[in-house]
Amino acid sequence: MNIEELKQKMDEAHYIYDDTLATVLFVALQLGRPLLIEGAAGVGKTEIAKVMAAALDRDLVRLQCYEGLDESKALYEWNYQKQLLSIQVNMGSRDSDELTRSLFSDEYLLERPLLKSIRSEKPVVLLIDEIDKADEEFEAFLLELLSEMQVSIPEVGTIRAKSVPFVVLTSNRARPLSEALRRRCAYLYIQYPDLEKEMAILRAKLPHVDDRLCAQVALAVQKLRSNEAILKKPSIAETLDWVAALDALGIRELTPDALRQTAGFVLKNNEDFEVLEETQNRECSCGSHCGGHHHG
């Protein structure tokens, strides 16, 4: 696959990208380098892994990170129930050393996302989502996989990748990631889309919706994101949900009433609702925009 073919595949997936993003994706893919994508929550980092899986016609294997994540959830664990059953059935009928060896064979190994991705016969896209939520010990454990494309299991030994996955790591920057991890990855920082890009996303994902309504919503979302008082900045997915909600109600214009009725699709806590209300009241009291369409 060359870079133009990759761009064509992303176009087919209705994914809006720029040349920098397409180039980084292509080169990381060609070099077999993991790709670390950072940015605020909701800018579309996870979507990139999904689009790449579709573009490459590969399965997407996802590891959702969280505090306390360890090898048994990320890499493998043993099927203890099956092992106990085997011990009960074979007790006395098999040599104890042979039985012990058999208990730690493939038959009793439960694959978790990391092991599944490197033991797959066909290459996959491995998404390690929100790596910043996992602790530093887990991050250190990942280094062997990312640099050597292999993992070590004490009872089995080293398992090398049958196929090399395209690895995408995402981070919301909740904590700093180690330099060792960063060195092993290509890097991409995703910002919230500007007005023009957000409009392009809305057109691509919701082509049946009136362009004027999309423009009004995109502008309102830009204003919400730039408002320092808003605690949870609207994500791209929430922008899409908001337009879909307005469209489902047959609303063709983002009036103050329409905004109030549907704001729950774009704002997700009471404090932000109060900020919106204060902003609208302030605009009305100073006589500007009150009958207009660009509240936010």
Task: Annotate each predicted stretch with a short phrase.
Residues 1-296:
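C-terminal regulatory/interaction module of P-loop NTP-utilizing enzymes
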